[in-house]
Amino acid sequence: MYKISCIHPTCRPSLARKTREKWMAYAKHPEEIEYITYFDSFDQKELKKKIWKEKNNVEVYSKYSFGIVKKCNAAAKLATSNCIIVATDDTIPEIDWDEKVIESADWNSEVVLNTSDGTEKFDKRAYMVKTVILSRKRYKKLGYILHPNFKHVYCDNFHTWISHKDDVVIKRKDIMFEHLHPSIGKSKIDQFYLNASTQEEYDYGLKVFQNLIKENFNKFEEKKLFKKYLDESDPHKKYILAYVLLSAGVDEAKLINNSQVSAKI
């Protein structure tokens, strides 16, 4: 059985295969990794073939679908390991990344790993979970890798929020999966990036995000997490709890005022 399943959604076949080569070359034990690349294809021969396998490399060919979400969830159905990682065209791991990931958690439990992606200097949202890495147990509980109501934008925001809400995140910022994102000048802007970055897509993603929070948060959870927030002494953990509560619509003044009272007590 493989220890890690990489699932890689893509509409850029050439770049995806080059990226896959780097992931496997940088792994300490590539033979323990299955790499599933899920392609948007316009080639009728590929579409008829549907799937190609060679050792631990799997390629799946499907008709075009916008964004990464649909392809991620379809690829995950083929994953066999207890640790599932979403690879992307513009994400490159560090040397021996696989060993570090495996040693970072009990992958038989329900867990989400939060690593570094090199954008922290520009992205000040310290709550964001970088690179989607989760256990099979977590995947099975959710029923998806990225919520299927999303197309692309904001899917990582909801992954972050629900992972923190459920308190399954393990912080390992010493592990790097570098995100070569065009917005910080690490790669060139292409048509896919432009299509995924329109105001319309952001508005759609935000609406889905807000609706899903409403569906996944109730007064009981608010009361439980609010008490946890008041009792928490670790500044970072308190910040994360504040993020979860504020995103769910809890009044900021309530957090500040009650936190001050709690500190006095």
Name each model feature, range by range.
Residues 21-32:
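Short, acidic, metal-binding catalytic loop of nucleotide-sugar glycosyltransferases
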Residues 31-43, 61-62:
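Short beta-strand/loop segment that forms part of the nucleotide-sugar
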Residues 62-79:
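Glycine-rich, basic loop-to-helix element that forms the pyrophosphate-binding segment
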Residues 81-92:
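Short beta-strand-to-loop acidic/aromatic patch adjacent to the donor-nucleotide binding site
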Residues 96-112:
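Conserved donor-nucleotide/metal-binding helix-loop-beta segment in metal-dependent transferases, i.e.
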Residues 111-130:
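Short beta-strand-to-loop element that shapes/binds the nucleotide-sugar donor at the catalytic cleft/hinge
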Residues 136-153, 161-172:
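Aromatic-glycine-rich donor-binding/catalytic loop that engages nucleotide-sugar donors
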Residues 157-265:
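C-terminal catalytic/acceptor-binding lobe
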